[in-house]
């Protein structure tokens, strides 16, 4: 199925690209999320007429994401207290929700879906570097300091 992308989509393309995707992917994800429209003659003409407006909107979203990333980077470190054993192993773990709540409490609103834990959940006391994907192109880093209660 041919679609016109209205937003940058990972591993697919960016604004204005006409790409061929499976019908289910287009019907169930791209179109309902507002990331694409079917590539009919009418939609192609409509898109070309609004291209500058859509590019400006995309630039505004990117600028807002970069501003949020700067706020997150400015935090430098966030401390989370959790129960731990003698050897520094936590009872349980610290996941994306706990990290998002701690960063939000520190003053920057973050959704748990933006937290990236490349090595899985945090299970030990100490400092851990955590990435945040604020936008498809914008990343931020914060050091999470896990301390025993």
Swiss-Prot record:
The keyword RNA-binding applies. It comes from the Bacteria. The keyword rRNA-binding applies. Keywords: Ribonucleoprotein, Ribosomal protein, RNA-binding, rRNA-binding. It holds the Pfam family Ribosomal_L9_C. Belongs to the bacterial ribosomal protein bL9 family. This is Large ribosomal subunit protein bL9. It comes from Klebsiella pneumoniae subsp. pneumoniae (strain ATCC 700721 / MGH 78578).
């Amino acid at each position: 199925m041919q679609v016109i992308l209205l937003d940058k989509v990972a591993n697919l393309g960016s604004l204005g690209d006409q790409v061929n995707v499976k019908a289910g992917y287009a019907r169930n994800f791209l179109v309902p999320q507002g990331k694409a429209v079917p590539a009919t003659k009418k939609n192609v003409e409509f898109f070309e007429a609004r291209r500058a407006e859509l590019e400006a909107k995309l630039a505004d979203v990117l600028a807002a994401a970069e501003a949020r990333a700067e706020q997150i980077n400015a935090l430098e470190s966030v401390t989370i207290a959790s129960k731990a054993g003698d050897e520094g192993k936590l009872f349980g773990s610290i996941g994306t929700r706990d990290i998002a709540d701690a960063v939000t409490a520190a003053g920057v609103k973050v959704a748990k879906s933006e937290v990236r834990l490349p090595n899985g959940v945090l299970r030990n006391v100490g400092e851990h570097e955590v990435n945040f994907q604020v936008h498809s192109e914008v990343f931020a880093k914060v050091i999470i300091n896990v301390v025993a209660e």
